[in-house]
Amino acid sequence: MKLTFLGANHEVTGSCTMLEAAGQRFLIDYGMEQGKNVYENQPLPVAPGEIDFVLITHAHIDHTGLLPLLAHNGFRGRIYATIPTVELCGIMLRDSAHIQEFEAEWKNRKGKRSGAEPVEPMYTIQDAEAACRLFLGVEYDKRIKLAPGIEARFVDVGHLLGSASIELWITEGSTTTKLVFSGDIGNLNQPIIKDPTYIQQADYVFMESTYGDRNHDPRPDYVAELAKILQRTFDRGGNVVVPSFAVGRTQEMLYFLREIKEKGLVKGHGNFPVYIDSPLATEATRIFRDTDPDCFDAQTRALLEKGIDPINVPGLRISVTSDDSRMINTDRTPKVILSASGMCEAGRIRHHLKHNLWRPECTILFVGFQAVGTLGRTLIEGTDLVKLFGEPIEVKAEICQLTGMSGHADKDGLLRWVNAFTEKPRRVFVIHGEDEVENRFVDTLTEQGFTACAPYNGAQWAIGAEGAVCLQEGTKVRVEQRTGEGANRAATVFQRLLSAGKRLLRVIEHNEGGANKDLAKFADQINALCDKWDR
């Protein structure tokens, strides 16, 4: 068999590995690169129509985001994933397609003035829907036959609802070789989902290394910590605004908030309202509720057996339309607002920041990683002033963070996972980590007696009865990037402008069916703004 490493090698997004074995050609993940891009991903070395099937570890876009493009370009095989992953991909790939369409539309409006050739979106809603029709949901822990000589099993890896490590048994001639692809390995003791499953045997392992050189901070009692934040904020008469990732983190927060209300941990404000103001988060929450309870951890299943919905918070209110969203801030009752995006770069959260950042009685609570250059990172690092929608906003609200919340295993967790094999694999291929992190994790594994390496994008390896042989080293081609503080600032600000444009398009769609008088006024305001800046 032959393996080609196509993406997320010496970087953390754009996961893709191609296998050619037992007369079949197939992919493990086909993700989109996001954020900082260091090394060029390799294009598929064959036509998409020549791919027989795809196996998906979990629903995050950096593992699935190019599936609509694959379908657009002629792929017609099956996409295998766990049942919850199939459901989540149904909403996340469509959301990604909306973004692709908007970005192409924006570029064409800009390019038209300079006579540039029109550009097409990377893929469309129709492409996303075509990809979704190719999915086939499989059960955890069930060994399935994919083709003659190829069998697979998906086991829960505790990263996200539906996430899996994939065990592969490949038989060529009289030799059967077992490969294990870790997927993103989860953190221990996350609410709702199970801890990672440990696998006992493999010949070759392909494992992620996101936190391969560091451990997480000690984990506080999140329920107690959150209750303290709510108590002091509500006592001041303020709101707690939570920028939250739509899938996974929002549902964790609902779990904590339900427990806080159930135990009466916030005194004098027991019936405080909780708002979800994110269409994607609302859809994801519905999927969590509809998922087979066997996918949940023991504590969550115990609640369900008692008739308790673990993410149903008394006083929960769902904001659907833009009018619903606006009404949240007209009500001065102290409340919790969960809204996307988690790093404050786009979405309805920016409106909630505009209405709450300047109020010293309010709190902005961060519950996830904030990348360098994002508004969320700026607020956490401390700033007195931000600009939202062209308006300067003083930062007077309390800014705080629940530390240690991560869906990824840290260094100790990764080592615990790989050391669970009863016999050391013949080789560990380290993937899905930043450049130096992968190298350091290879060194750590080597010190512990493993044979390990970290291939670059484009590397090819042959695996047979005699072992693994490198056929091609891969390329260390770095993506050209603008350098300098000014360039980075310009790129960040322009991304904010693009995000604002995406939001405007969504608001327009939400107003479909409104009164003609209101729609005409809205159109006039947009045209006036365009006239001002179309120069």
Where on the chain are the PLM-derived regions?
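His/Asp/Glu-rich metal-coordinating catalytic cores
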Residues: 1-55, 60, 64, 71-252, ...
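Hard-cation-handling environments
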Residues: 229-374, 386-387, 422, 437-439, ...
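Short, surface-exposed amphipathic charged segments that create phosphate/polyanion-binding patches used
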Residues: 150-154, 287-295, 415, 465-476
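Short, compositionally biased "basic patch" segments
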Residues: 191-206, 293-300, 370-396
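Generic long, charged, amphipathic alpha-helical segments
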Residues: 387-418
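Charged, amphipathic alpha-helical linkers/stalks
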Residues: 458-521
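Conserved acidic residues
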Residues: 52, 203, 335, 362, ...
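A polyampholytic, Gly/Pro-enriched intrinsically disordered region
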Residues: 100-105, 292-305, 387, 469-495
